[in-house]
Amino acid sequence: MRVKITLACGECKQRNYNTMKNKKNDPDRLEMRKYCRFCQKHTMHKETK
């Protein structure tokens, strides 16, 4: 089952990315290194509600 999730920057808490994930394969909260245009650098982005 695929669900929509939002990724928020770990430093400035801005919600920068929307994506989909498969809950069966990834039951935990997703964490990725992505570019934050507000911080103007690559930071850890965490899944939010």
Swiss-Prot record:
A GO-annotated cellular component: ribonucleoprotein complex
PROSITE patterns recorded: RIBOSOMAL_L33
UniProtKB keywords: Ribonucleoprotein, Ribosomal protein
Bridged cysteine pairs (disulfide): none
GO MF annotation, one: structural constituent of ribosome
Biological process according to GO: translation
Gene from which this protein is expressed: rpmG
Pfam families noted in UniProt: Ribosomal_L33
Family indicated by similarity: Belongs to the bacterial ribosomal protein bL33 family.
Protein name per its UniProtKB record: Large ribosomal subunit protein bL33
Top-level taxonomic group: Bacteria
